Every structure is written in structure tokens, then in C-alpha cells.
Amino acid sequence: MTDLKLIALDSEDLEVLSAHVQDAVVRVPDMAYARADRRFALLMNRFDWESGRGRREKGLRKRAALHFDGVQSVATHGFDPAAPEGVLDLLAITFSPIDGPAGIVELSFAGGGTLRLGVECLEARLTDL
């Protein structure tokens, strides 16, 4: 199977991208904000939904990178962003517009943790590694 490469430039695109990363496992140390580049990136082990296996079957996981451009701010809630052994289960990614194309991207994790990115506009890329 070919590797997945997706880009999200609006809320509908992001819904598709979010579905592909649902139940992904993310290590806290594998998340980083490059302030000078206005980019937030994270590595994950995502469930390979395209393999056609159901939830109850032992599925495959793929290593993937997700990054957001035009990031102006980053805020976390419900987890320690400096935890060297922290592991999070990604549930969903949503976008809430605020002013024009600007808005908030929210990554929701199991257990109530959230990561909020203030962005100039929505631009996200998911790439299997």
C-alpha cells in the first residue's frame, strides 16, 4: 500500500485528516514548536485505517508526521508538555475560525488533554514516513 499524504486547508479537509489520525499514539517529546518558522510538528504512530481491518482486529500502525504552518501560539491543557515519558492518544483534530482565515486548531487527547494552536490560517500536512 502506498504511503498517505494529506493536506488540510479548510475544516472539511481537516475532518478527513482527523479521521486518519484517530487513535494515533503520540509521545510528548515528539511534539515541537519552531517559533521562528511558525510551525508546530509532531510524530505519531497512527492506526492504518486504509488497511481495511476493523477495530477489533489487530491492525497495523504507521509512523507519520503531522505539521501545521502559520502557528502564532501554542497552549496545552491536561498534560505536561515537558514530560519526557508522556504518551498521548489522539482522538480528534478540529478547527474553529476566529477572524477571517485565522482560528484555533485543537488536538483532543484521551483523558481530557488538549493542544491548542492559534493559526493565521488552516494549513496542515500529514505524511506517512
Residue ranges and their predicted role:
Residues 1-129:
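Surface-exposed, interaction-prone regions used to assemble/regulate multi-protein complexes
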